């Protein structure tokens, strides 16, 4: 059985009482997010009001989800914990390692062959430790979770930053690094800074070409990629009723691009219907019995500004189709503005490829509505100018969409149907192009559009839109086509318009599938052997990191001073590097290769202070490590934005980088650095960033007095003999300081 139904029955039997106790203790009405948080305290006796954005709280999530690229490192760490089985229900999803090339029929067998060693490892670990296993082709982790595991009022963590997708079905679902997941898998408390609460008030109703995707694209323009840091976005208002559960999941999914801890919608009839349509009638009934506590209290809705830290107002009737980009998901542009904005910013205006899919927009409803546009192009005889690529979200969706003729609608206009996997969204795309460095534009229904992310080309301008708009712009081949107002020519030269998209929320004949690709957790695990070859270049057993030696860090060479945006894609690239996600030594060769060096404006070219040569970042780091020298990275704002990949923290740790000094950090990455025993520090005065010079030797003092709220001192020794001194700060609590001293959180846990 896929679901752990006894766990769910037990949860719902006590949920409303837990919420009632919370309200009685804090003596006030609660938002929905607060209800879920308080119902999942690791130690219910610690129930009290917590200072949002400041205090750390221990929680007990209901389950863990892991995708194949991050599960490798998470499970390698779990294997060192000495447990016989996982403490909570868990699942592994093989969706990240499948490369999109010529189509699913050939790509999936090739992936199974290429990644056999990793798939065998993940399958055997899953069998040994009682973890559900979704094989290659089964689907994208977050779509599979929504269809099978998500439940209103629950809490889950996932080793992927878009885990908040499950908030569309009323979960507090948080993206974490593997070390955080191991805490939950081993039954330990999971620590999280009590989030701030941003209330998003939805009024009106979407119409025409406007979609749920456009709601979150508009919010990104308002809040930016930093605006949700250490916050939960909770949606409320009469506008909720007009948005489907999968539409709500799309909105929650891209809350990750705001830096939000997660996003959440309350339980409603749409959620109940989704549960029933996906074969979870009992959960729908259990949720209905608790419905009063699966939403914010009436007093909160009557006076939201008294309960939320910030309110965002969105009138759905005024939402326009958006194209966000290029290079950052918060560059929000209503499609009606693109005719002026495109040429003014020298965008390449020809759309060469349109890509529909990803964990953000690959539901049945997404494909059905996008197919209605493809169908019009075929029926009206409109020449399709761009290449269209489709990645269904799960085998259940693919099978049902094929049965219902949806995939045929795409194929009739020349679309390629790729595997049920992430594919191009994470750089797993063998793009067929005449020049992989040429300036060009693509449009996607994905969630991120960082430079080089999709195809490795720094000159690909990637724009994010809805599946419907993506198909329309691909048909026309222009970025500045507004389907609500513009005409195009049919095969006879007549002016025609594309009608607004239509499509069923659920398949009229119900969902269908022959083989979901799922292997249930097994109780017969005693004889399962997990084999890792010592000669493997893809999997490597982990050795513990060394503990702190009790001394200040002196005369550290500057490894790199990064300039501008430095995401986890810049720190640890995906694409061709995904195959090394289970081998820390090998993947460390990509350390910071995408980051821009502030001193020369180039990527992956830094000065090795030992000989003055300019080399790759990892080469310099390895040279310092070989001499027993630790180094430091200096960065700007929101360092580590993007995915949850803990490799972006483990790689510098492995190469003896001890400190990341930034203007600010993204939430998940800051936690990952702490978990690996690194020092994630911030400038007290951001202008001190400008004092750091290329040849500096940098010292950090005050570590013997390292304590919550304490300041540390940085000394820059410049090449000319002069010095600069300034203070830096941190957000470490006592437990996190203990992780640093032990060498990592895993080391600390092993000592307890």
Where are the model-predicted features located?
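Mobile "lid/hinge" segments at catalytic clefts and subdomain interfaces of large enzymes
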Residues: 3-4, 68, 151-284, 416, ...
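Short glycine/threonine-rich loop-to-helix capping motif typified by GTGT followed
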Residues: 47, 147, 151, 243-249, ...
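Long, structured ligand/cofactor-binding scaffold of large enzymes
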Residues: 8-11, 15, 20-195, 581-633, ...
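Acidic, glycine-rich flexible loop/linker segments
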Residues: 488-505, 670-739, 746-749
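Extended C-terminal subregions enriched in glycine
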Residues: 379-429, 435, 643, 649, ...
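Non-catalytic terminal/interface segments that mediate subunit docking, oligomerization
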Residues: 76-80, 305-401, 405, 524-659
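Terminal amphipathic helices with adjacent charged low-complexity linkers/tails
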Residues: 42, 46, 51-60, 74, ...
